[in-house]
C-alpha cells in the first residue's frame, strides 16, 4: 500500500514519525512526497509495464482508439500490446485499431498507474507494480527527496543505489513478440 511505501522510504532516510498523521515532522518532505512517489511510479511503470486485457464486440470498419479501450476497461492506456479475435490493422502509429471484420476483439495492453493525489487514502491505495519494482522504489524516492539537501550526500547515495537496482529489474514484460498470420510465400 501507499502507507507501507511511505513508511519504508521515511524509515530509510530516518525521517519516520509513526505518531504524526503525515508520518514525518519535516514539512518539506511531507509536501513533496506524493509528487516524488508519482514520478518514480510512472518511471518504473514505463520499464515494468502494467498489463491489462479487455474484450468487446466490434463491427467491420469500426475504428477503436484509446478512449474506447479506456471506457471498456476503466484504465488509462499506455500502449497496445496485442490484438486478437478479429482481423485488424493499426492506424495512426498504433494508436487506433481498424476492425476489418465484425466479432469479439481481445486487446492486451499496458496501462498507466493510478496517480496519487492529495485525496488518495494511504491505507487504501494499492500499487500495481511488480514486487521487484516496488522494492527499489523507496531508494528512488529517497534520492529525489534528499537531492536538494546540500548538507549531506544521502540523496546521491540513494540515487546511485536506485539506478544500480533499476538495471537489475526483471525485463519479462519488456520482451517483444511477433505474430505471423496467414503464412509466408517463398
In which residue ranges do the predicted regions lie?
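Glycine-enriched, solvent-exposed interface loops adjoining structured elements
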Residues: 1-186
